[in-house]
Swiss-Prot record:
One of its GO terms (cellular component) is plasma membrane. It is a multi-pass membrane protein. The keyword Transmembrane helix applies. InterPro entries: ATP_synth_F0_asu, ATP_synth_F0_asu_AS, ATP_synth_F0_asu_bact/mt, F0_ATP_A_sf. The lineage of its organism: Bacteria, Pseudomonadati, Pseudomonadota, Alphaproteobacteria, Rickettsiales. This is ATP synthase subunit a. One of its GO terms (molecular function) is proton-transporting ATP synthase activity, rotational mechanism. Key component of the proton channel; it plays a direct role in the translocation of protons across the membrane. The chain crosses the membrane at residues 29-49, 84-104, 114-134, 140-160, 189-209, 210-230. It comes from Rickettsia massiliae (strain Mtu5). PANTHER family: ATP SYNTHASE SUBUNIT A. The gene is atpB. It holds the Pfam family ATP-synt_A.
Amino acid sequence: MTHSPLAQFDIKKLIDIKMFGFDVSFTNSSIYMLLASILALTYFYLAFYNRKLVPSRLQVSAEIVYNLVADMLNQNIGVKGRKFIPLVFSLFIFILFCNLLGMTPYSFTTTSHIIVTFTLAILVFLTVTIVGFVKHGLRFLTLFLPHGTPLWLAPLMIVIELFTYLARPVSLSLRLAANMMAGHVLLKVIAGFTVSLMIYLKFLPIPLMMILIGFEIFVAILQAYIFTILSCMYLNDAINLH
């Protein structure tokens, strides 16, 4: 029997839990998010628990990741962005480890589900909105009226800018989920063809499969970066009212 390429995204209950009328069951998605968090914490613990003047390769790799996120905030927000390093760094690492964990055979890609990515996007959206109002008060609403807009065009621009602002969590979450799902479906389909082709071409299709896996790993890293850089840009709008 041929399995559907979409079967890999099925949510399966492991522990059925009902709380206050809500289904909060522990699923395969839950366990892989927990596993990604544990792996991330273990990685950074091993990298930094015994820091040395001459760093190990593990410490160097962890410092590169940290500096990457710090540079993103610095380039987009400036010095004011340093206080958001814990939030943005946690987002980047969580998404990165979830994406990469999903590349292992017979695993589950949590970031291919819109409910997971939308939750992360809503976290960014609420943070940006709260920071904007706390820092600027009602002046934050000027974000919806670009500077220099003619008075007669102001109502239309406000509606457009407000719609664009409210659409941010949707576009942010859909981009990540769609890319991760599309990549894994493509790999599943091509892997099926590769097995069939090996009957006639022996091991020749394997290099092609390895290239595609390498490309998908690149996409997994890139999508974590894109989600994070867009989060930094949204924070910049709230802090500097651009």
